[in-house]
């Protein structure tokens, strides 16, 4: 299929002040059900017998100036309230959160990502990197994960003694945690291939897992019409502390391209490099 958008549906017709007609609908980016459904708008024209059809040769709408949306995903957790980019998973529990000295402390719940407390933000890119500084309390397990639902997630969590790497809900591996209860975790999702890293200072990183396939963690396999979102996780006892959460588009910029010149390519649909 050459179409850049799949599973188009639930269209709504609207007209503008100039008498032009449009259809607003949702769809999945080709090959990226994990990003969830996007909202799109497309011009239509009316036929002589009163039906409508999309305009196949439509010209893309060009804004007069580049507009950046105002929702920044990175967060320094200065409080006193949670940022609008965050949402709880199947609960609303603001009393489980405490802000202190630029650290978000989140009370634990459950034992694993399937029943633990998860705070989510929606990734915007097909190639992105996210990281956070984590502090685990006594009896606490905390981490940074990609989360679709209770049956579909991947990432890294730790109790301060061992790192637990989830490739999915059914597949978990363990590695010694030589850093301790205070560590940094970083995830790089490039085209639904996930890499997991940890660090003691946020500068030098150790790769725990790479090239993990997360392309199947979406609605067609697990239902729900969600997206595979970035999650902060706290389970066990006490609370976990999170600080300096960062999210960025990981597509190399022009100034960084010297090392990529031999492999750079342009993907008209959804570029990753």
Feature map (PLM): residue ranges:
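Long, internal scaffold/assembly segments composed of regular secondary structure
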Residues: 17-18, 64
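Structural WD40 beta-propeller signal
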Residues: 14-16, 47
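Conserved blade-ending motifs and adjacent loop-strand segments that build the rim/top face
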Residues: 1-14, 211-221
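Extracellular glycan-recognition regions
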Residues: 30, 42, 48-273
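Entry beta-strands of beta-propeller and related beta-repeat scaffolds
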Residues: 19-23, 51-52
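Short loop/turn segments immediately following the C-termini of beta-strands
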Residues: 26-28
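Short strand->helix junction
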Residues: 3, 30-31
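Short, solvent-exposed loop/turn segments at conserved positions within beta-propeller repeat blades
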Residues: 34-37
